[in-house]
């Protein structure tokens, strides 16, 4: 069916579920095939909401010399704190009506996300940080990294709605 759209998969891989290191390795491998193109990286339990049209954000990055755009997780949860069953007919906004910041305080899950980047920008496991010279760019250094958009902490931050239907 995908071939009918003129799309040929780069690679077909079968791995055990929740093998985050392998997922990140594949993201990086595929991105490096087009190092000067812009890539949106999103896991299948995430929906990214941009504060303005993505082409405007990328144009700003190209004009100002930024190479990656970051965001942060908004954890989604169902009524009474449940993780509801999801299938292809589910309206996820209806069954996950609540959002907040609870996974980090409860489990230490990293809330950062590198959402959009040039293909040559390597990302860490979980796509939480950009990696330069084999070092994760994080914390205050990451917030003010010269290649990061938005600079500092503020306008341009992408909302990453995290629907934990695989919990």
Model-inferred region functions:
Residues 37, 45, 67:
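Conserved acidic residues
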Residues 21-24, 50-167:
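Catalytic-site signature of metal-activated, phosphate-bearing donor transferases
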């Amino acid at each position: 069916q995908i071939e009918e759209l003129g799309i040929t998969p780069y690679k077909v891989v079968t791995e055990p579920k929740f093998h985050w290191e392998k997922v990140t390795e594949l993201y990086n491998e595929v991105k490096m095939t087009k190092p000067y193109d812009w890539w949106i990286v999103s896991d299948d339990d995430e929906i990214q909401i941009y504060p303005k049209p993505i082409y405007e954000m990328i144009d700003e990055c190209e004009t100002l010399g930024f190479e990656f755009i970051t965001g942060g997780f908004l954890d989604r949860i169902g009524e009474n704190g449940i993780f509801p069953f999801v299938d292809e007919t589910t309206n996820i906004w209806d069954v996950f009506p609540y959002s907040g910041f609870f996974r980090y305080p409860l489990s230490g899950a990293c809330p950062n996300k590198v959402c959009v980047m040039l293909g040559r920008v390597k990302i860490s496991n979980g796509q939480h940080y950009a990696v330069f010279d084999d070092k994760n760019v994080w914390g205050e250094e990451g917030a003010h990294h010269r290649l990061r958009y938005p600079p500092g902490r503020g306008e341009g931050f992408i909302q990453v709605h995290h629907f934990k239907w695989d919990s």
